[in-house]
Regions:
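Generic leucine side-chain signal with a strong bias for well-ordered alpha-helical environments
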Residues: 28, 46, 62, 66, ...
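Histidine-centered phosphotransfer motif of kinases
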Residues: 58-76
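Conserved short strand/loop->alpha-helix "switch" segment adjacent to the catalytic nucleotide/phosphoryl-transfer site
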Residues: 40-64
């Protein structure tokens, strides 16, 4: 897989295609150690919802990247993570709300070839069916969201 500059994310939250059937929210302190807690929480919840293993693995990676970005780049004290499974149980939406007051949009920095960090949103772009960011309606900052189609 070749990673390039992330394309601009969608700036509006698309309307849900169907009425949500299952929803789960949890908050965490914005600490480096919270990524592990988030991964464990998401993995446990999606297994309880009996989602396919591939979907669970992709969702765990997405949450890990989103929370790591929030911790490293937003100055937030807390983050709020939401999982929503649509009524047809085929679409999983992941939301990460932070306390960042910076303008909504893709980051300015692009990782160079020798840099170890700076490719998280490229992974999000490659793994998610769709993703974007907008002003949060649940926190004082923004929300970065990603959607997956559950593997059959």
């Amino acid at each position: 897989m070749t990673l390039s500059t992330p394309s601009a994310p969608a700036t509006a939250l698309p309307l849900a295609r169907t009425v949500p059937r299952r929803e789960y929210w949890f908050g965490l302190p914005a600490l480096c150690t919270s990524a592990r807690s988030a991964r464990d929480t998401v993995r446990d919840r999606l297994r309880a919802w009996e989602l396919p293993g591939d979907t669970c693995c992709d969702a765990v990676l997405l949450v890990s990247e989103l929370i790591t970005n929030a911790v490293l780049h937003t100055g937030s004290g807390r983050v709020l993570c939401g999982l929503t499974l649509t009524g047809d149980e085929r679409r999983l939406r992941i939301e990460l709300h932070d306390e960042c007051s910076a303008p909504v949009g893709p980051p300015e920095h692009r990782a160079g070839p020798g840099e170890e960090n700076g490719r998280g949103l490229l992974l999000v772009q490659q793994i998610a069916d769709s993703w974007g960011c907008a002003r949060s309606t649940r926190a004082e900052g923004k929300v970065v969201w990603a959607e997956l189609t559950a593997a059959c």
